[in-house]
């Protein structure tokens, strides 16, 4: 299996480069006879749709946003266990999950950025645990906030 992450970046190239890349994907699928998995945003799907043969080889699957449930608590517990902090980070709770998911807008990549920033703040401050205090110390801005900041700068 060949997993291609950030597949939407194919759209960054010019039309000739895009076509060459899509041809390469088709060639790899045919020659290697292995499944291809493309991961990316909505734009990744649009790039694949531009080639009829490739579109038939990919089945789009939408990943849902994370919700505060047992799977999420397990994910948060795994994150907490992975950070080299001296104190236990109690982030795998319903209240903390809702707070974290609201700030990260429910995506795992944003959640990881937020928690890494909080772990750094916890270590640098001597707190040695992720909690509301260390989360408020981060300079993390979620996707919507970053867009608003960018749009303000354009004005």
Q: Residues of each region from the PLM?
A:
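C-terminal alpha-helical "lid" subdomain
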Residues: 69-70, 78-155
């Amino acid at each position: 299996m060949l997993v291609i992450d950030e597949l939407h970046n194919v759209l960054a190239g010019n039309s000739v480069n895009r076509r060459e890349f899509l041809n390469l994907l088709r060639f790899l699928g045919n020659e290697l006879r292995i499944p291809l998995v493309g991961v990316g945003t909505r734009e990744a799907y649009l790039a694949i749709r531009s080639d009829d043969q490739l579109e038939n080889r990919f089945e789009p699957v939408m990943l849902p946003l994370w919700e505060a449930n047992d799977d999420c608590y397990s994910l948060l517990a795994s994150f907490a266990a992975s950070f080299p902090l001296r104190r236990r980070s109690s982030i795998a709770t319903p209240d903390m999950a809702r707070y974290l998911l609201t700030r990260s807008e429910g995506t795992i990549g944003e959640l990881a950025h937020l928690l890494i920033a909080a772990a750094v703040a916890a270590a640098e401050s001597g707190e040695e645990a992720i909690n509301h205090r260390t989360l408020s110390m981060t300079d993390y801005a979620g996707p919507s906030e970053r867009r608003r900041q960018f749009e303000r700068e354009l004005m």
